[in-house]
């Protein structure tokens, strides 16, 4: 009975316990077609065969039933029982049209069925056309999914299709449905006297906005007034989105689904319809607007001696751009110069104290694109954080902190009020240790004895490396050691900012958590405290949508960088090695911040290179030549693949060749 056959059979014996267990998770699909359900809290993913997807697609939130538990490994196999929420309903791809029927072939590297398109839903699409299609029906996996053409792209719309594809792949709807737009149209822009008497009136207090030159929505304004006691009151006034977006309405559901606006180089996919974001809630100059405000009274020493929170009505006297305010700060001249200069001094002091108290001063670089009429990039610059940006940043941080502190002290039946905090955990030790070794090799001491020591070490390192070749690499590696900031009702503080209490209150036009915060704060002020039992689930959803938006924004930036570099094929650039791996090293160009890969294969003509992980370096086995993180190199643009959003570089051993000015 101990035959090899019996032994083999015993290894695959299925444990038949707990097979009624179901889990909720997210479906990931490998290139092979196999599925894996990622469940929060489970150490191992649940394996699902393609025949058990039950119409689920990559990224869908699903409910899965366990069908088998493998003996020995304990690995679970399952079957999708229900699709809780589809990640993506719009897809980019190509049309294939027959005599009596048509199919849409999705542009994806992951296995996905073709979508049947009824002939009356083609909207004029022809075979070979690049289109966006919306999934409208898929009753069961024995039938083809059904959809309709949303948009047809001509060659000159290549950029438009790419941006829409990125947004759709990230699970964000491309348009608002008719019900949402119709609801938004019904909202009145008239402010009634009855509404004004319910609010604190700031219409006669000096108020202004400071925003980018091309901003279309202004969701925050600052007021400034001298009080009779000699103190100064600063008001942070935020568009009162929750007044217009009531829970359970069509527009609220659409906003929650998105949870955030998505900002791409040439467009914005807003969380709210433009009727709300760009009109009703935009704090435009010379218009009365409804706001939700946090004000703080500051004495002669800069100490906050009193705070107030509540609904207000304002009248913005002036719209400043960041450039306007920066000019006033530098020249000491301009409209409302006294107020601007006082706020500049005050916020620089806030900033200084914040870093002294443990905040970390990472200065990540943000690229900006100059685009032609068709959306093609013709220039890339790096956005600078100047004093004018810091003025607004510090006031917003202070308002968010004060609101969170206030709500942290509210009790409901002797229990802490559930509240959507913005939290940031301490660095991961496994990620931190290699970074510390790398920093010390470059001559930068690093103390990891406590969280405070870590924060101060990061700040000292950033200061000491400023202007040096390795600065950007150290910043990027340092950021990678950090945990991701998330929304949760479990307040563990915000390590990166050095705050014990923090939330997002100041951008409800573009972030749904801010809407949740406004509603809860108002319920506390009204004495009818909102205790949302589903709040943690909403926090998790908002965190996931935020990550998806960031991935879309990174993908769009990468697309634009690759598109820009197509015009520079064969040209050489100075760069900094920004990453090393067994398959090559990544280089970021100094001039344009475009990152590409120098493959190990392209280096083989020089030497046989191997990765030394502890050194973050590739080392030649014969020559000993090292490519270290942070090294300056010269690279030639070898390939620019728009479909994959990838740049290939080749190392230039002899320096700058064919450099294009």
Could you describe each region identified by the protein language model?
Residues 1-233, 242-288, 617-623, 628:
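Charge-lined substrate channels and their catalytic hotspots, especially those that engage the 3′ end
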Residues 21-23, 137-139, 155, 159, ...:
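Electropositive polyanion-binding surfaces
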């Amino acid at each position: 009975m101990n035959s090899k056959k019996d032994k083999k059979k015993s290894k695959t014996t299925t444990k038949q316990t707990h097979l009624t267990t179901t889990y909720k998770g997210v479906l990931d699909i490998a290139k092979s077609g196999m599925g894996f359900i990622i469940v929060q809290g489970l150490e191992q993913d649940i394996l699902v065969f393609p025949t058990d997807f039950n119409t689920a697609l990559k990224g869908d939130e699903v409910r899965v039933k366990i069908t088998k538990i493998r003996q020995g490994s304990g690995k679970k196999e399952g079957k999708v029982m229900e699709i809780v929420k589809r990640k993506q309903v719009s897809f980019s791809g190509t049309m294939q049209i027959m005599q009596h029927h048509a199919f849409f072939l999705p542009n994806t590297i992951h296995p996905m069925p073709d979508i049947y398109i009824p002939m009356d839903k083609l909207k004029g699409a022809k075979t070979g056309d690049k289109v966006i299609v919306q999934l409208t029906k898929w009753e069961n996996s024995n039938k083809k999914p059904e959809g309709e053409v949303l948009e047809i792209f001509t060659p000159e719309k290549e950029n438009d299709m790419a941006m829409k594809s990125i947004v759709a792949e990230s699970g964000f709807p491309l348009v608002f449905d008719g019900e949402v737009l119709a609801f938004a149209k019904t909202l009145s822009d008239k402010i009634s006297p009855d509404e004004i008497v319910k609010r604190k009136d700031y219409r006669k207090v000096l108020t202004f906005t400071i925003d980018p030159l091309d901003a279309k929505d202004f969701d925050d304004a600052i007021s400034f007034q001298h009080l009779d006691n000699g103190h100064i009151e600063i008001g942070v006034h935020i568009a009162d989105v929750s007044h217009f977006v009531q829970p359970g309405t069509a527009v609220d559901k659409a906003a929650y689904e998105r949870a955030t606006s998505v900002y791409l180089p040439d467009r914005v996919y807003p969380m709210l319809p433009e009727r709300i974001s760009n009109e009703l809630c935009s704090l435009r100059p010379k218009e009365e607007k409804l706001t939700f405000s946090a004000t703080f009274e500051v004495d002669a020493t800069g100490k906050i001696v009193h705070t107030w929170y509540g609904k207000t009505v304002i009248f913005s006297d002036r719209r400043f751009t960041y450039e306007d305010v920066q000019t006033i700060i530098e020249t000491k001249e301009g409209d409302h110069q006294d107020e601007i200069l006082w706020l500049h001094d005050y916020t620089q002091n806030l900033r200084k104290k914040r870093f002294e108290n443990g905040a970390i001063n990472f200065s990540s670089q943000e690229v900006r694109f100059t685009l032609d009429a068709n959306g093609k990039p013709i220039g890339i610059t790096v956005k600078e954080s100047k004093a004018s940006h810091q003025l607004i940043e510090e006031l917003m941080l202070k308002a968010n902190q004060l609101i969170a502190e206030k709500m942290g002290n509210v009790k409901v039946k002797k229990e802490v009020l559930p509240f959507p905090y913005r939290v940031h955990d301490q660095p991961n030790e496994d990620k931190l240790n290699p970074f510390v070794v790398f920093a010390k090799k470059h001559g930068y001491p690093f103390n990891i004895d406590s969280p405070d020591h870590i924060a101060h070490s990061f700040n000292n390192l950033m200061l000491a490396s400023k202007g040096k070749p390795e600065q950007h690499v150290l910043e990027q590696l340092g950021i990678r050691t950090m945990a991701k900031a998330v929304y949760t009702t479990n307040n563990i503080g915000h390590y990166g900012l050095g705050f014990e209490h923090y939330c997002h209150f100041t951008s409800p036009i573009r972030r749904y958590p801010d809407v949740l915060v406004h509603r809860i704060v108002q319920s506390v002020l009204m004495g009818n405290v909102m205790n949302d039992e589903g709040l943690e689930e909403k926090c998790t959803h908002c965190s996931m949508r935020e990550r998806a938006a960031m991935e879309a924004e990174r993908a769009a930036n990468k697309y634009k960088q690759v598109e820009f570099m197509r015009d520079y094929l064969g040209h050489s650039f100075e760069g900094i090695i920004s990453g090393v791996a067994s398959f090559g090293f990544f280089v970021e160009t100094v001039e344009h911040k475009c990152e590409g890969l120098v493959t190990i294969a392209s280096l083989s003509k020089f030497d046989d290179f191997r990765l030394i992980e502890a050194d973050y370096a590739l080392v030649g086995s014969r020559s000993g030549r090292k490519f270290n993180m942070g090294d300056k190199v010269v690279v030639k643009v070898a390939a620019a693949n728009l479909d994959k959003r990838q740049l290939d570089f080749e190392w230039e051993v002899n320096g700058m060749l064919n450099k294009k000015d």
